[in-house]
Swiss-Prot record:
Organism: Wolbachia sp. subsp. Brugia malayi (strain TRS)
Oligomeric form and interacting partners: NDH-1 is composed of 14 different subunits. Subunits NuoA, H, J, K, L, M, N constitute the membrane sector of the complex.
Keyword Translocase: yes
InterPro entries: NADH-Q_OxRdtase_suN/2, ND/Mrp_TM
Name of the protein this chain belongs to: NADH-quinone oxidoreductase subunit N
GO terms under cellular component: plasma membrane
Enzyme Commission designation: 7.1.1.-
Membrane-protein topology: Multi-pass membrane protein
Gene this chain is encoded by: nuoN
């Protein structure tokens, strides 16, 4: 076994453990900076050690190839952005906060490379357990404690469902290795027990993604958790789970399951965008609103993925990348607002007080809504094109209607910024965070000029599936 190939994972877990010990010596700000630095180093090592050919370390517990390394890179970049927001923000939590983020990042990068039901479940739990603590990290806030308890309770239920699905899959096949499962499913008739087991595993994944009808936890947890945690929840775990689902359905891991899963995935993705569109209409809390928004965006990604074509896969990844950039840009401002009072009213009148900031926030919101010629428009255009080319015209119309409805709540925020009276809330504006917001906004503006290049790059990565 070449130890160079597993150096990113090795460095990630060792650096997390070392920083956990160093927290006793150094102050929390230093640990936060070191956590950011270690994640950047992990990304650099990953880039330098990446290879096109497949590699199966630890007796095939993991699989490493170009697609998996690219997915891990996306996860680490999203994690770096959240850690950057943490270092630039008002938050002064205990040093364990950034360490928990490092542990969950390690769980995510091993999750997307898992090649065995056991390694997959262990990675899934290593990703999940720190998230429970992060959601309830603000002990002084009853909302944060409530969010942690709700998330833990429902996540435990979803983990049990997933574990039961894995036991069914093992019981009917006698296998746990993904490659061996693929060969078994290709050469044997699919029984209802196997299909039911796979459905239960999918339910567990859909819960973490907050896909309808397993979305009920998201609005309460997003609202109650510290805003920096909400920023993490809405981006990094979604990157990990979406990239794993792409490998799950489009790779060699599970062959022949498309006909069983396509109708289900299409229906729940349509349900997600409709619940998102109507559920967010009456929300005045920004974090609850973005929770419903994320349900809809993941619905778009899942719809494109459920087509089971290369174009659909590429479109879902483009959408994911643009969604992460836009979300980070929005949260770079929202984390400056009080965690327990993150309402739309706090944005009232900033179009007059801080016109440049309001402009950049408007660009990001327009992109979220899919207004041309911003990056969000092209992301949705690729999704619609994938659906139409595959013959799902009726489904495309549902998504178009949901997109039009969702424009209302994005525009209501812009209306508050420019036309409502300035609020009395005292927000301490950070110049550093303003730069993050501006960069995310500018990326959304200029990306339409090179969206084809991004598509070609993603297509090159997915060819290795």
């Amino acid at each position: 076994m070449s130890y160079i190939q597993i150096l990113p994972e090795t460095f990630s877990i060792i650096s997390s453990l070392v920083l956990l010990l160093l927290g006793i010596v150094f102050n929390r700000r230093t640990i936060n900076l070191l956590a950011l630095g270690c994640t950047v180093i992990t990304l650099i090592i990953l880039i330098l050690s990446a290879k096109d050919s497949g590699f199966f370390p630890f007796n095939s517990l993991l699989k490493l190839d170009l697609y998996i390394r690219s997915a891990q890179g996306l996860i680490l970049i999203a994690g770096i952005l959240v850690l950057l927001l943490l270092n630039l923000s008002k938050y002064d939590y205990e040093y364990e906060f950034s360490i928990l983020i490092l542990f969950t990042l390690f769980g995510m990068i091993t999750l997307v490379s898992a090649n065995n039901l056991i390694s997959f479940y262990l990675s899934f739990e290593l990703m999940s357990i720190p998230l429970y603590v992060l959601a309830s990290f603000n002990k002084d806030s009853v909302y944060s404690c409530e969010a942690g308890v709700k998330y833990f309770t429902l996540s435990a239920l979803s983990s049990c469902i997933m574990l039961y699905g894995m036991s069914l899959l093992y019981g009917y096949t006698g296998l746990v290795n993904f490659s061996e499962l693929s060969s078994f499913l290709e050469n044997h008739q699919m029984t209802y027990g196997i299909v039911f087991g796979l459905v239960l595993i999918l339910i567990g994944l859909c819960f973490k993604l907050a896909i309808a009808p397993f979305h009920m936890w998201a609005p309460d947890v997003y609202q109650g958790a510290p805003t920096i945690v909400t920023a993490f929840f809405s981006t990094v775990p979604k990157a990990a789970l979406v990239t794993f689902l792409i490998r799950f359905f489009m790779g060699e891991e599970l062959v022949g399951v498309e006909k069983y899963f396509q109708p289900v995935l299409l229906y729940i993705s349509a349900l997600s965008v409709l619940i998102s569109a109507f559920g967010a209409l009456r929300q005045r809390n920004l974090k609850r609103l973005l929770a419903y928004s994320s349900i809809g965006h993941i619905g778009f990604i899942l719809a494109s993925l459920s087509i089971f074509t290369r174009m659909g896969t590429d479109s879902s990844l483009i959408y994911l990348v643009i969604y992460i950039i836009t979300n980070i840009g929005l949260f770079s401002y929202f984390i400056q607002i009080d965690d327990d009072d993150c309402s739309v009213a706090n944005l009232s009148g900033i179009g007059k007080k801080r016109p440049v900031l309001a402009f950049h926030l408007s660009i990001l919101l327009f992109s979220m809504a899919g207004i041309p010629p911003l990056a969000g428009f092209f992301a949705k255009l690729f999704i619609f094109k994938s659906l139409v080319n595959s013959g799902f015209i009726g489904m495309s119309l549902i998504f178009i209607v949901a997109s039009v409805i969702s424009c209302y709540y994005y525009l209501s925020i812009i209306k508050a910024m420019y036309f409502d009276k300035p609020s009395d809330s005292k927000v301490i504006y950070s110049k550093s965070l303003f730069i993050v917001t501006s960069v995310a906004s500018l990326i959304n503006i200029v990306l339409f000029m090179c969206v084809e290049d991004l598509y070609s790059l993603i297509h090159l990565v997915t060819k290795s599936l």
